[in-house]
Swiss-Prot record:
It comes from Dendroaspis angusticeps (Eastern green mamba). Keywords: Disulfide bond, Secreted, Toxin. It comes from the Eukaryota. GO terms for molecular function: toxin activity. This is Fasciculin-2. SUPFAM superfamilies: Snake toxin-like. Changing H29D: 73-fold increase in inhibition potency. GO terms for cellular component: extracellular region. The record marks M33 as: Blocks the entrance of the active site gorge of hAChE.
Length: 61
């Protein structure tokens, strides 16, 4: 699966992920900025909302 991958300081690049899920991590509270994207599905917490998705490619735009 092709996923977007970046952190707050890097530009988004497309990465070919071994697993078939991508995630998009953002702040739960305003300002709701996106903090990163990547492969897999890490857990969120009280401050971080993690949206995971599988297929199609680039689903974590």
């Amino acid at each position: 699966t092709m996923c977007y991958s970046h952190t707050t300081t890097s530009r988004a690049i497309l990465t070919n992920c071994g697993e078939n899920s991508c995630y998009r991590k953002s702040r739960r509270h305003p300002p709701k900025m996106v903090l990163g994207r990547g492969c897999g599905c890490p857990p969120g917490d009280d401050n971080l909302e993690v949206k995971c998705c599988t297929s199609p490619d680039k689903c974590n735009y």
